[in-house]
Amino acid sequence: MAKSRCCGSQSRSRCCRPRQRCRRRRRRSCRARRRAMRCCRRRYRLRCRRY
């Protein structure tokens, strides 16, 4: 289930890699996961908000 969340979540390389899945999986996950995601906090900081 961690893989189907926003941008991966626990995986470091998977967190800032599958941004296309983020857009199709769930939009609320990204917002809540944005805080849990450290690698996504910088690169997907604005993008996570859109997904």
From Swiss-Prot:
GO CC annotations on file: nucleosome; nucleus
Keyword Kinase: no
Locations listed in the record: Nucleus; Chromosome
A GO biological process held by the record: chromosome condensation
Example GO molecular function: DNA binding
Keywords: Chromosome, Developmental protein, Differentiation, DNA condensation, DNA-binding, Nucleosome core, Nucleus, Spermatogenesis
Tissue-level expression: Testis.
Record Pfam families: Protamine_P1 (PF00260)
Domain of life: Eukaryota
Protein function: Protamines substitute for histones in the chromatin of sperm during the haploid phase of spermatogenesis. They compact sperm DNA into a highly condensed, stable and inactive complex.
Family: Belongs to the protamine P1 family.
Name the record gives this protein: Sperm protamine P1
Gene: PRM1
